Amino acid sequence: MSQSDADALPNVHVRAEVLVQALPHMQRYDEEIVVIKYGGHAMGDRAAAEDFAEDIVLLEQSGLKPVIVHGGGPQIGRMLDRLGIKSEFREGLRVTDEATVEVVEMVLAGSINKQIVGWISAEGGKAIGLCGKDGNMVQARRATRTVVDPDSNIERHVDLGLVGEPERVNRAVLDAVLKAELIPVLAPVAVGSDGQTYNVNADTFAGAIAGALRAKRLLLLTDVPGVLDKDKKLIPELSIEDCRRLIADGTITGGMIPKIETCIYAIEQGVEAVVILDGKVPHAVLLELFTDYGAGTLIRRSGA
């Protein structure tokens, strides 16, 4: 044995320990569907994006059936600015008119979707890019939002334009893709019963897909470590009841509330558990699925 081989032995032992730890997790998820929502913010880091694609290919090669749903808010914003189209947000959602929805579809179902497919292909995977309109996979209805004025306590409706929420998922399209051993990469653009195109929030879209597929896990990759308590410390696990209590007492606020609502919906539709985790952490998906420690906040129907 050469000196260089001898020096490498400690690292080999560490890698062996990692593989031993990962094996039972791989067996647990064999042939199981895992839906992963990949946010637009994470795509800005090319190295992190390539790591993500590598992880997805490894999941597929390990026997899992990954389904990717991606966002693209920052990229949409930049394109709207470039085209001189003003954009407005209400209640955390982009108000979408006819001009905006054309840009949303172009960016999400076009450039971003194919970019992710390309990254996965470069790592040796076989991915196919689709949006909710393809095969009438996701039918949406116009989203409605009601807010309460804190001063008068009067409810008012917020018009979001062509923002949709999933009404029906045709899982036969996804079943066919998965049976062909392809990795679906889905853009959250859907169609209404009248043929109208709708911009759907990526978290909401991912929750509907996961629920329809009865996925083993739904992973929501975000730009925060997970759900935080009032001291800004990570909460490792929550039940649905815990989530509702933390919303009521003001611990969970702002943009985390719709994410939690998506988690609750998905679990009630049959998803075993949902994890909110930081997509900027290298190999966060593998850490969550294939290690004893996990990553982020695990949400399930009831406490362990």
From Swiss-Prot:
Which cell locations does it reside in? Cytoplasm
Q: Which residues are recorded as binding substrate? A: 72-73, 94, 199
Q: What is its EC number?
A: 2.7.2.8
Q: Name one Pfam family in it.
A: AA_kinase
Q: State a GO cellular component annotated for this protein.
A: cytoplasm
Has the keyword Glycoprotein been applied to this entry?
A: no
From which residue to which does the signal peptide run?
A: none
The family annotation for this protein states: Belongs to the acetylglutamate kinase family. ArgB subfamily.
Q: Which PANTHER family match?
A: N-ACETYLGLUTAMATE SYNTHASE, N-ACETYLGLUTAMATE SYNTHASE, MITOCHONDRIAL
Q: What name is this protein filed under?
A: Acetylglutamate kinase
**Native source species:** Methylobacterium nodulans (strain LMG 21967 / CNCM I-2342 / ORS 2060)
UniProt lineage: Bacteria, Pseudomonadati, Pseudomonadota, Alphaproteobacteria, Hyphomicrobiales
Task: Please state the gene responsible for encoding this protein.
Answer: argB
